[in-house]
Every structure is written in structure tokens, then in C-alpha cells.
């Protein structure tokens, strides 16, 4: 490996501009949380005692139409034959992911993340929003780390991301707990594998990957979120290496250079 900073390739850019530089069959595990587009399905504010009203308008970026078909070809191209693809999604996007990916993998399935502390339904007028879906795909030779049938349920349970883990500055509306990301990484990859998250947010997938001895490539278009991700990932590096490695903030001004410097990660 040429560059000792291979572990923390964190880029502030549009993922569509980055993914084209990634070589074919080079990623072991794509674990990502793209927009759900729930903002378009908002039914208005739900008043909650002692806190801001809740609605589906999580952020302006969630209102921009997200088309899974625009990502399917590149995901398939960069994923190794032994790789896995896990995508957090919602009821309104699950079918779209299925339609563009199911026929291109040997197996597609889904996991359920059961949130043990969802927002309450004050007026008891419907189900609690206590579950999120993860669409999963793989081929026959994929990495799969289970030691018993009991572990193989497609169901994972944890609270939503809370303080002190949840960031307040910046506050990301859909920050995922590192604990569930680590569980997925343990299942679907091996130490030293390359994990790719093209919708990195504040870097939780990167934190989980590095804590488990994996390599990580993360891309985030929002500068504030990306800065937070870099800070969190640098903290992990410093904690795990007594001498510490200087955190190389990438020069995001020249996209054409990404293929030259950052992709040293793929060279043994």
C-alpha cells in the first residue's frame, strides 16, 4: 500500500463525479444511506411536547428526486464478485431499488432495523415509525460472516442515534448509530476490506469501518457534514495509533486528481 492514509479517503464532492474514478471490481462492501425522498410525502406537522414538531421534511436535499437507476450501473461495476450491497431506504423507495437491482444479482433481500425509541404518536392515530428497511444484494460467492443460525435473522434492533453520539453541530437529521453499522460491516466484510459510502453524511459508516479494521472511502456533497465526518474519522485514527498519522485533508478543487491520489487505496 503506497499511502499510509489509505484508511481515511474522505471526499467533499458529488458522488457521481467520484464513483467514475473507482476501478471495476474493487469495492468489497457498499454500505450507504441515500435520500429517502420522504419530504414529498409529508402530511404536515405532528406536535410533540417539549420539542419541535415532527414531520417528514427532514431537509431540502431530501425533496430533490432521487432515482436509484442512476446509481445501479456504477454500484454493480465497482463491486467485487464477492461483495455485498446494503442500502438504507424507505417504503416509497424500496420497490425502485428492487426493480433496478434484483435481476442483476443472484440474491436480493431486505433487513429491518427496529428502532426501540421511535417518536411517539401523541394522538394514537397510526403505527409508530419504528422500522427502517435496508435493501441488500449479493452474488453466490459473497462474503458472509455468521457463526450460527440464530444470528442470521434479517432483523436488527437498537435505539435511534442519541447523544452523546448524535452530533448537534452540525445536526444531521438521519444520522445512523455506529453500533448497527458495525454489525452490518461485521456480517458483510472482512478485516482490511474496502467499504464505500457515497452518501456519507457525518461519517458514521467510516467510524464503524475504521473501528473494525476496514478501509474506507466516503463521499459527501455537503461541506459542513463532510468536515464533521473528517473530524470524527481523524479522532478514531488518533485513538487507535499512538504515534498518530497526520490527517491528509484532500484537495477537493480538482476532481481529475482523485483517480491519481485517492485511489492508491486499491494498490497492494
Which ranges hold each PLM region?
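Conserved SAM/SAH-binding loop
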Residues: 12-17, 246-254
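Core catalytic lobe of class I
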Residues: 1-227, 265
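Long, low-complexity, intrinsically disordered segments
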Residues: 258-268
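Short, intrinsically disordered/low-complexity patches at protein termini
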Residues: 43-45, 109, 230-231, 240-242, ...
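Alpha-helix boundary/capping detector
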Residues: 83, 101, 211, 235, ...
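Short linear motifs centered on Gly/Pro in flexible linkers and helix caps
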Residues: 53, 230-231, 260
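Short, basic, helix/turn surface patches
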Residues: 135-143, 243-252
Amino acid at each position: 500500500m503506497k499511502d499510509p492514509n489509505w484508511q481515511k479517503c474522505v471526499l467533499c464532492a458529488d458522488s457521481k463525479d467520484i464513483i467514475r474514478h473507482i476501478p471495476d471490481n474493487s469495492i468489497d462492501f457498499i454500505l450507504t444511506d441515500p435520500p429517502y425522498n420522504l419530504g414529498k410525502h409529508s402530511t404536515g406537522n405532528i406536535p410533540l411536547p417539549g420539542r419541535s414538531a415532527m414531520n417528514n421534511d427532514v431537509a431540502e436535499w431530501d425533496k430533490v428526486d432521487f432515482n436509484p437507476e442512476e446509481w445501479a450501473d456504477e454500484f454493480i461495476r465497482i463491486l467485487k464478485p464477492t461483495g455485498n450491497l446494503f442500502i438504507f431506504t424507505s417504503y416509497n423507495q424500496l420497490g425502485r431499488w428492487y426493480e433496478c437491482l434484483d435481476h442483476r444479482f443472484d440474491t436480493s433481500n431486505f433487513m429491518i432495523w427496529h428502532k426501540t425509541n421511535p417518536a411517539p404518536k401523541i394522538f394514537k392515530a397510526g403505527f409508530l415509525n419504528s422500522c427502517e428497511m435496508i435493501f441488500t444484494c449479493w452474488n453466490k460467492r459473497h462474503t458472509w460472516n455468521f457463526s450460527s443460525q440464530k444470528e442470521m435473522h434479517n432483523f436488527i434492533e437498537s435505539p435511534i442515534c442519541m447523544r452523546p453520539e448524535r452530533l448537534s453541530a452540525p445536526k444531521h437529521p438521519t444520522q445512523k448509530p455506529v453500533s448497527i453499522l458495525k454489525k452490518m460491516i461485521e456480517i458483510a466484510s472482512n478485516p482490511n476490506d474496502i467499504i464505500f459510502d457515497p452518501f456519507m453524511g457525518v461519517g458514521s459508516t467510516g467510524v464503524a469501518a475504521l473501528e473494525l479494521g476496514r478501509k474506507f472511502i466516503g463521499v459527501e456533497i455537503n461541506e459542513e457534514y463532510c468536515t464533521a465526518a473528517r473530524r470524527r474519522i481523524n479522532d478514531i485514527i488518533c485513538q487507535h495509533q499512538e504515534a498518530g498519522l497526520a490527517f491528509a485533508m484532500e484537495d477537493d478543487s480538482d476532481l481529475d486528481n482523485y483517480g491519481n491520489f485517492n485511489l492508491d487505496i486499491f494498490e497492494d
